[in-house]
Each structure stands twice: as C-alpha cells, then as structure tokens.
C-alpha cells in the first residue's frame, strides 16, 4: 500500500506531462489527434509512444565474435576520425561517446552477476551445483564484453545482450534470430574438441528456453487487448537456407527442437523456415512435436516467397536469404534493419462501414471519414469500391503522418543507442537507428479485417447489384440495427453469397483485391528516414477489440463481434470444404505484396493426426500450400471441449499453450473475449 501511494501521489503525477506518450500530442497533427481521441477509430499508433520500438533483430553474431569490447574500440576509432567540418559533428560525437558509456556499463553489469555467482558458490554445499556456479562466474567475467569462446559463453553472451536491450527500451519482440545458425560454430567446435557432449548442449539450450519466460512486459489496457496474454514474442528461427541458398538444417537444429519440446513454454516464439531443400525428416520432427504438444507453437514460413518479397523491398539476395522472423510473423533481414515491424493496426472493416454510410460512424453517429457518397444513390458496384478505396487512402495517409511524427518524437527524446550498436550501418554512418542509421529502414503496418471486407463486397456485388435479392435500404437498415428486425436478411447474407475459404474464385479474388489495394496504398509512402512502409496482413488478437468498433457488415457478421482471425484466415465456420480448399483460397491473396507478414491459422482435432501417414499428409499440405506461394501457416491441435473446460477451470490448465495469432500464450491468461474467439475457430475433424 505504501508503494502504491508513492506511485499514485508522486511518480505518476511527475511523469504525466513528461512521458513520450503525452508529449506525442505536440508532435501529431491536431486534426489527427481528434480522430485518435475518439473511442471509434480506424487506426491507433499511440502504443508506439509508450516504449521503445523493439521489433528488430540485433546482430548477435557480431557480439559473439568481437564482444562489446570490439564495439567500444570501433566507437573510439570513429571518434578519433571525426571530420571537424562535418555538419553532424556534434551529434556523431555524442553518439559514439554514448556507445562507449554503454559498453562500460555492460562490463559493470556482467561483473555484478559474476560476483553474485561466486558468492553463491562459497555457500553452496552441493558439489555439482558449486561447480556450476563457479563456471557461471567465470563466464560472466568474460562475456558479453569479451568475444565468446565456447558454446556456453555464446549462450550467456546472447542472453546478456537481449536482457540489456529489454531493460533499456522496454520494447517488445527484440528477437533472437536464426539460433541454429548463430550458435552452430561454437557448438561444433566444442563437440569436436570434446569440451562437451550433446546432452550437455541440450541442457544448456533448455535453460536458455526457460530464461525467456523471465521477461514479461506489462502492457497498457489497450495493448493488452490487442496482444492478449503476456507475450514478449522473442522469436527464434530454425531451418531454411543459408546465404548461398543451400539447406541450413544442421545437428543443432534438432537439438533446438528437442529443447522446444522439453520446455514448450509460451516463450520463445520458435518459428520454422521451410525450403524445398530442407529434408522431410526435419518437417516430420516438427509435426511430431506439434501433435504431441497439441499445437500452439512452431509456425511455418515459406522461404521462397519471403525471399522474393524481401528482394522486392530492396534487400540484397544474401541478406534476404538470411532473414529471420521478428515478433510474430514479420520477415526481416538479420542484424542490419530498423524494422519497426508492428507500428500500427489498420481497421479495413471500419473503412467499409464508412464507405457505405458516406463517412459516418454508425457506432457513434459522428462524421469520421470523408463524404464519399451515399450507398442508396450508387448505381454500380464500382462506385462502392471507389468509395471504399477513398476511405482507405484517407486514413492510411493519416496513419503515415502520425507514425512519422512518432518517429521524430523518438529521434528527439528516446534515441536507441544500444539498439544502434547492434545494427549494421549505424556505427558506420554515425547515426542512431531512429535517425536512419541502419543499413535498411522500414515501418510495418498491418491491415485487419481483409476477409470481412472481401466477403461483404462479394455479398453486395452478388445479392444487391447482380441478383437483386437484397435492397440497399434493407442492407443499410440491417447494418444499423444489427439485423434485429430482419433476421432473414442475416441468413441470406451468410448463406446466399459465396465465402472466402472454399476455393471459390469469385469470393477469393474479392478478398485478394482488398489485400492488394491496402498493400499498394501503404507502399507509396516513405518514413522520415526515407525507408519504406511495409504492409502486413495479420492482427495478433487485435481483431477482437477492433471488431468492437465496427457495426454489422454485409457479410452477415454481427455488430461488435471479432473481425477475421489471423489476417488471411477464412472467417470462422465459413470454410466448409476442408483444409485443402482453405489453403487454396488463402494462396490466391498476393502474399508477396504483404512483405511485413501474413497469418494463416488452422485448427485440427487431435484424432486426425494419430498415425505417421496422417502426419505425412500434414507435411504434404504445408508443402503444397507453399508451392502456391503461401507465406505462413500455423496450427492449434485441440478440441473445443478442452478449451471450454480450461476456461471454466483455469487452475487445471495453467500450462496449456495455444496459438493466438502470430504468437503463443497460456490460454488461461488471455482475455475471455480472445478465449472465445479461439474456441470459435473452424475445427477440422475426421
């Protein structure tokens, strides 16, 4: 109570007008702030003002090779060679001096841990544990300041590097990258030299997996709704190809899978890169773990389409092949990219609502968007498409403006010096990563509700303009009243127009149009540092709170209910023809345009994956879907009965991990609305 009083009466009042969250109001245009202050909005970038950006891949390999000692030496060299006539002289001098101070701080921190472990060893009576503590102390005296010389030191160096980053900027999704590639040289050397055996390496990996549960980021109310659970989304990646395009699966890949199976916690968010060059043995091992652990983790990513998408973004072939996943599903070049991969969610379904009501929000009655015409007066389907596109373009422009303002805010108030030390390009340019210093610079923005919009447009085209089964007046009235006075209308909308997810070209191409229009609209803009805006088609759990802001839709969706899950997944219960048809529909969306990532969820009954033949069919499904240029797929393998039981008796299911969207979480820690949404997803059974 004393701490609470101190926080409420002294700490919070002091920071109220000093924190970046409040200062952002002076950076974002007043017209846009009025939109953001409304409880009903198309986008909300303000969570990016309350912490550092996170969402990037630090160059861990560099730290392992040269240590922070090497970083410090580089900074000193650049200080000595500064051009006195450089117009950025003062900024660069301060930048490099800040790096030196941080490197000195890293030494202080690791030595504190070394001292703690040594003191614990003095009091330890168990000889085995005493030796472990002494080894920990020895490692902490060396790394991460010095280069790592062993597998154990490499893991310890990595953990310090990540931990310091989280403490420093309080961001999310600062990810580990391709751990089976990064740590393999140290593993191979120690095995060949007899320093350790596989079982010891596996135990160290398991300890590393466990440590990732130490980092819990407490979010704001809104961020907790958009990202259910306590996911930090530190992503590990296994498999794929190397920089030369060859199979990258190695012995350490399988040990990492063993560690994942043994620990199987919500963190780290371990992902699987899939190439046609990877052996089926690798895929089958992943499927075995998925089935045994009832899914909930280990999403699959398609190397071929992702590498092509990154090349379209201007990434070199070598860097594109060395991509890893940031956070949930965001493909990002490793160690050289200021990605800002989860900058904002954009509510596409709200734009359709506004397009049908001449820019007026039906939840508040206020004029929110531009006047794009009254649906009652439209004489062709093309007019509603045009109105929808104008609403999207209007709000995307606002979103970009606000994000650029937030970028300036971070550059002015919260330079990410530590992050800059871990990104190629910043040291060389003398610029912080918030000021365009990294080799590559992007911002990722996610379109949410693509399928809801596509299915709604299909219904309008077919039932209103082509067949005349539904009048414009009845449709608008049904949307206003949530179909309460006309339940038959809802039935017709749900059942008499084709739905995405059933390999129906009419429905699928409409959804593909919605995704393409959003992606192209986003791609025309640059951020303050000249980097591109990269579109994504995923939602984490934001489809639930964003759905609360949208009235009933022509697809038959009720007012305030969740928008489509995943991002490119078919709507719950609408994919009636099984997983193959669903996958074929999803593959018709141009994933290559959505280079910031997509999310495709499937849910299976455990009973259909019992035998080796069943599991091989799942491997074949994944490879077939990827051959059609699908980017991502992931699975929950649970019965709805078990999830319902866990909802009723959470104390019995505290370790139940589920796949929410692009991340995993303990089911019992999720908001009930998100639990209900997961339970309601289409279940594929025998």
Regions found by a protein language model. Give the residues of each.
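A conserved hydrophobic secondary-structure block that centers on an alpha-helix together
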Residues: 121-124, 128-130
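Extended, non-transmembrane alpha-helical coiled-coils
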Residues: 108, 112-115, 119
């Amino acid at each position: 109570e004393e701490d609470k009083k101190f926080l409420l009466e002294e700490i919070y009042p002091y920071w109220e007008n000093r924190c970046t969250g409040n200062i952002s109001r002076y950076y974002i245009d007043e017209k846009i702030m009025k939109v953001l202050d409304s409880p009903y909005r198309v986008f909300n970038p303000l969570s990016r003002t309350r912490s550092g950006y996170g969402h990037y891949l630090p160059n861990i390999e560099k730290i392992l090779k040269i240590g922070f000692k090497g970083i410090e030496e580089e900074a000193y060299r650049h200080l000595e060679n500064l051009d006195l006539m450089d117009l950025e002289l003062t900024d660069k001098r301060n930048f490099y001096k800040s790096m030196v101070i941080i490197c000195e701080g890293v030494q202080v921190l690791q030595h504190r841990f070394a001292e703690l472990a040594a003191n614990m060893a003095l009091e330890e009576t168990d000889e085995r544990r005493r030796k472990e503590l002494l080894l920990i102390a020895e490692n902490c005296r060396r790394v991460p300041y010095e280069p790592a010389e062993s597998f154990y030191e490499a893991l310890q160096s990595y953990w310090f590097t990540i931990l310091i980053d989280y403490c420093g900027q309080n961001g999310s999704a600062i990810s580990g990258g391709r751990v089976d590639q990064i740590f393999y040289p140290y593993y191979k050397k120690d095995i060949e030299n007899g320093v350790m055996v596989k079982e010891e390496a596996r135990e160290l990996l398991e300890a590393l997996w466990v440590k990732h549960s130490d980092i819990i980021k407490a979010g704001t109310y809104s961020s907790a709704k958009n990202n259910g659970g306590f996911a930090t989304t530190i992503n590990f990646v296994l498999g794929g190809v190397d920089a030369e395009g060859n199979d990258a699966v190695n012995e350490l890949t399988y040990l990492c899978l063993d560690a994942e199976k043994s620990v199987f916690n919500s963190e780290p968010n371990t992902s699987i890169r899939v190439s046609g060059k990877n052996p089926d043995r690798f895929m089958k091992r992943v499927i075995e773990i998925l089935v045994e652990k009832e899914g909930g983790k280990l999403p699959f990513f398609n190397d071929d389409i992702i590498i092509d998408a990154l090349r379209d973004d201007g990434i070199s072939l070598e860097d594109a092949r060395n991509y890893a996943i940031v956070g949930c599903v965001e493909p990002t070049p490793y160690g050289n990219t200021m990605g800002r991969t989860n900058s904002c969610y954009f509510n596409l379904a709200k734009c359709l609502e506004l397009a049908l009501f001449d820019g007026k929000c039906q939840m508040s009655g206020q004029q929110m968007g531009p006047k794009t015409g009254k649906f009652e007066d439209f004489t062709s389907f093309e007019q509603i498409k045009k109105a929808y596109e104008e609403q999207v373009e209007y709000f995307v422009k606002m979103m970009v403006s606000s994000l650029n303002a937030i970028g300036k805010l971070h550059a002015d108030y919260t330079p990410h010096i530590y992050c800059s030390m871990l990104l190629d390009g910043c040291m060389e340019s003398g610029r912080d990563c918030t000021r365009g210093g990294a080799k590559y610079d992007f911002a990722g923005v996610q379109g949410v509700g693509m399928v809801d919009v596509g299915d709604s447009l299909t219904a309008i085209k077919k039932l209103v303009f082509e067949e005349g089964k539904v009048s414009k007046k009845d449709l608008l009235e049904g949307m206003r009243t949530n179909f309460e006075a006309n339940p038959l209308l809802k039935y017709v909308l749900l059942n008499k127009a084709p739905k995405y997810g059933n390999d129906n070209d009419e429905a699928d191409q409409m959804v593909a149009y919605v995704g393409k229009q959003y992606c192209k609209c986003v791609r025309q803009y640059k951020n303050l540092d000249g980097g591109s805006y990269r579109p994504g088609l995923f939602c984490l759990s934001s489809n639930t709170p964003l759905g609360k802001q949208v009235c009933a839709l022509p697809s038959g969706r009720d007012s305030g209910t969740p928008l489509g899950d995943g991002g490119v997944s078919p709507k719950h219960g609408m994919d009636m023809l099984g997983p193959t048809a669903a996958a074929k529909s999803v593959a018709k969306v141009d994933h290559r345009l959505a280079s910031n990532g997509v999310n495709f969820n499937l849910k299976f009954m455990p009973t259909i994956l019992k035998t080796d033949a069943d599991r091989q069919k799942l491997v074949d499904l994944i490879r077939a879907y990827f051959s059609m240029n699908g980017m991502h797929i992931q699975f929950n393998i649970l019965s709805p009965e078990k999830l319902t039981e866990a909802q009723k008796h959470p104390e019995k299911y505290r370790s139940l991990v589920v796949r929410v969207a692009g991340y995993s979480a303990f089911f019992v820690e999720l908001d009930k609305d998100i639990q209900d949404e997961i339970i309601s997803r289409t279940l594929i059974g025998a």
